[in-house]
Design a protein with these regions (language model features):
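N-terminal ligand-binding/catalytic initiation module
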Residues: 1-166
């Protein structure tokens, strides 16, 4: 199940994603390898990134690697509604709407974590900061985030609890 602004925006998002796929040869090579090797077979991956065409492509590459991918935005102001709709159209559970309130944004993050991910990729640290609270995904074994944006999100005053995964 996805939560996006408007599924009728999907054609525009599909065009953007296709353009990126045509002009990102590094990920294309990785995708080819993942298609053959399926390194993420049987794993659920929650991905919190700026929800736009380049990062949507990353989600598709992870899916080619066998992962069950659940995608959300790491910043409601950078989420592109057409790309979110396109990903939902392509069968990737997507939780992202441009311009939501802080509470709605957190609700989208919570929805994403309901998949009980084995792995978490988090650009800003907001998704990881929810771990350890009442929505802790007990099957998670690792989380990765981009260091600088996550520094504030994961500082002791902002995080919900200690992060229970490496």
């Amino acid at each position: 199940m996805s939560i996006v602004k408007d599924m009728s925006l999907a054609p525009s998002g599909l065009q953007k994603i296709q353009w990126v796929r045509d002009f990102m040869p590094a990920l294309s090579g990785i995708e080819e390898r993942f298609r053959k090797e399926k390194p993420f077979a049987g794993l659920t991956i929650a991905v919190s990134v700026h929800l736009e065409a380049k990062t949507a492509n990353l989600g598709l590459v992870l899916r080619e690697g066998g992962a069950d991918v659940h995608l959300t935005g790491c910043n409601p102001l950078s989420t592109q509604d057409d790309v979110a709709a396109a990903m939902a159209h392509l069968g990737v559970d997507t939780y992202g709407v441009h311009g939501v309130t802080p509470q709605e944004y957190e609700d989208l993050l919570v929805e994403t974590l309901k998949c009980c991910p084995h792995l978490i990729v988090d650009d800003g640290g907001d998704l990881i900061s929810l771990l350890g609270g009442p929505i802790w995904a007990s099957g998670s074994s690792a989380a990765a985030r981009r260091p600088l944006p996550a520094f504030t999100a994961l500082s002791p005053g902002r995080r919900r609890a200690s992060c229970p995964v490496p």
